[in-house]
């Protein structure tokens, strides 16, 4: 069977909500890593790219109407290169890599770019049309995160718990204490700060150059969401606003962020022809559904499924990149998979609690980080997995080349 390989990848810094990248449209943001991949790989013939596949979770504003195609054109790729946008909410970026890998394995392509983008700062407010003439019953939604235009049948059958409420549900079900969550969040901040100061994160990043109305140029080189000075005392002092006697706080949850990432996925033959060096083989991918109110546990069945497909066990994984939507759900996943809370090979360079979680981009970031870390550790296998709103999980296994 034909195999699919990650040959290169790059991402923007992750911007804080309303921060350094908030002035950049989603389509312009996605164009940045696409353009950089061509610069980094001068032998690559862009005319040979079969498709560009990007994940994006919102698609209600400037990211509407197929942001992948628009970003492809804005990046200067040939008009002959097609682009498509997929939406599996938080899992969109990882799913994009899976789509690219399946195309190669099926013989439907040899060279693709896959990744994801999200500008949560620029997510618009939306309002539906009136149900009847002259109606005064209008409802407006903030599309940054969460439900909008809810189907009443969905609400009746499955509820409309917010993302923090689903994390509260997981914490209650599995008896995950506030203390354990805050300790996990602190480790995320500490590991991320160390990775940033040592230059590990810089290996993944292309700086974003911005010019304001006065012509002043600013170069954004680093992720800006992390808080390296965080202490356990500070985390313990934060309020839990989502439920009486709750445990979910701003400190043990991921951020609302902006960012984009893109990776080159190629067959072995095309990689050689284009002067590309395979770094990781995409072994297998799986998705799974869970109860929407417990969406944070989605990585558990998805991971078990992908391990079964690959004929591997969780103990074969040298690196695990688990998206930290919330400390509660990350801990729930680790415990259900039989892993310790502080496993050194799980998110060794921190995670979304510190880095942030630009929804459509995050899965691509996980794969990029995992492929780098496998080479640093001389490991063989990596697992990338994440929970998904409305009750899903996604998981992918990579093998170092």
UniProtKB/Swiss-Prot annotation:
One of its GO terms (biological process) is DNA damage response. It is an enzyme of class 2 (transferase). Keywords: Acyltransferase, Transferase. Transmembrane segments: none annotated. PROSITE patterns: THIOLASE_1, THIOLASE_2, THIOLASE_3. It comes from the Bacteria. Pfam families: Thiolase_C, Thiolase_N. Catalyzes the thiolytic cleavage of the beta-keto C8 intermediate 3-oxo-5,6-dehydrosuberyl-CoA with CoA to yield the C6 intermediate 2,3-dehydroadipyl-CoA and acetyl-CoA. Besides it catalyzes also the last step of the pathway, in which 3-oxoadipyl-CoA similarly is cleaved to acetyl-CoA and succinyl-CoA. This is 3-oxoadipyl-CoA/3-oxo-5,6-dehydrosuberyl-CoA thiolase.
């Amino acid at each position: 069977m034909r195999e699919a390989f990650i040959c290169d990848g790059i991402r923007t810094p992750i911007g804080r909500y309303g921060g350094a990248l908030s002035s950049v449209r989603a389509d312009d943001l996605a164009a940045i890593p696409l353009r950089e991949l061509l610069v980094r790989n001068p032998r690559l013939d862009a005319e040979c790219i079969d498709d560009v596949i990007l994940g994006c979770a919102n698609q209600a504003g400037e990211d509407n109407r197929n942001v992948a195609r628009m970003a492809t054109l804005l990046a200067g790729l040939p008009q002959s290169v097609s682009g498509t946008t997929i939406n599996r909410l938080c899992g969109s970026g990882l799913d994009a890599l899976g789509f690219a890998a399946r195309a190669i394995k099926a013989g439907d392509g040899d060279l693709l770019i896959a990744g994801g983008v999200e500008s949560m700062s620029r997510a618009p407010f939306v309002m539906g049309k009136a149900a009847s003439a002259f109606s005064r019953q209008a409802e407006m939604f903030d599309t940054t995160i969460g439900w909008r235009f809810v189907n009443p049948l969905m609400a009746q059958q499955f509820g409309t718990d917010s993302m923090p409420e689903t994390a509260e549900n997981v914490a209650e079900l599995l008896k995950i204490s506030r203390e354990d969550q805050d300790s996990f969040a602190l480790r995320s901040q500490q590991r991320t700060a160390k990775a940033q100061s040592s230059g590990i994160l810089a290996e993944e990043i292309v700086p974003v150059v911005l010019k304001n109305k006065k012509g002043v140029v600013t170069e954004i080189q680093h992720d800006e969401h992390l808080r390296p000075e965080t202490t356990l005392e500070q985390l313990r002092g934060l309020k839990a606003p989502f439920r009486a006697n709750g445990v979910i706080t701003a400190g043990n949850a991921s951020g609302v962020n902006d960012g984009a990432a893109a990776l080159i996925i190629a067959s072995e033959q095309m990689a050689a022809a284009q002067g590309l060096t395979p770094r990781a083989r995409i072994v297998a991918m799986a998705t799974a559904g869970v109860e929407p109110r417990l969406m944070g546990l989605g990585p558990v069945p998805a991971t078990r499924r992908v391990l079964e497909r690959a004929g591997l066990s969780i103990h074969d994984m040298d690196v695990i990149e688990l998206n930290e939507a919330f400390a509660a759900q990350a801990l729930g996943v680790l415990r259900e998979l039989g892993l310790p809370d502080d496993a050194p090979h799980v998110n060794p360079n921190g995670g979304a609690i510190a880095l942030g979680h630009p929804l459509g981009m995050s899965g691509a970031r996980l794969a990029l980080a995992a492929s780098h870390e496998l080479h640093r550790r001389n490991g063989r296998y990596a697992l990338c997995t994440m929970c998904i709103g409305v009750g899903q999980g996604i998981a992918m296994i990579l093998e170092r080349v």
